[in-house]
Amino acid sequence: MKIRVGFGFDVHKLVIGRELWLGGIRLEHEMGLLGHSDADVLIHAICDALLGAANMRDIGYHFPDNSADFKNIDSKILLAKTVKLIAGKGYRVGNVDATVCAERPKLKKFIPEMQEVLARVMEVDVDDVSIKATTTEKLGFTGREEGISAYATVLIEKD
């Protein structure tokens, strides 16, 4: 069995007038993330980690932000496409460990639903999707509630 590890990061600015999507679910919040797609930073970080692990470049290469095909697209679709891309090289998702950095909204109660949604899209067990949430103790752009960032580490496998 061949095992590879990948790391991903994403950040988007918070703005008024957009829906907030994180981990494939819509959260009630007065601001949302600005981006070409739905701007789900958690899914984007996971996509980058998966693509990196398979040595397949990054999310911007496969799903460019200047393409009308991806305008306002649901990031779960991008994640499903990413899983298919790595499967094309014989890989499957082993596990995901991710962290979201945000002052608000508090994410603890939403994490189980995010895990279920992401596990379903990636075709893995819920136990294979770890999501953590933290703040930056009011420091930096996330601390000032100007944006949200996410980090993801993944393991992919092939026989």
Can you describe what each PLM-predicted range is?
Residues K2-P112, M122:
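RNase III-family endoribonuclease catalytic core
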Residues I111-Q115, E145:
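Short, low-complexity, polybasic intrinsically disordered segments
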Residues L118:
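Glycine-rich, mobile lid/loop segments that gate access to catalytic sites or pores
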Residues D125-D128:
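Short acidic capping loops at alpha-helix termini that bridge into adjacent secondary structure
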Residues I131-T135:
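Pyridoxal 5′-phosphate
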Residues K138-G140:
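Short acidic, Gly/Pro-enriched loop/turn segments at secondary-structure junctions
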Residues T142-D159:
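C-terminal edge-of-domain segments
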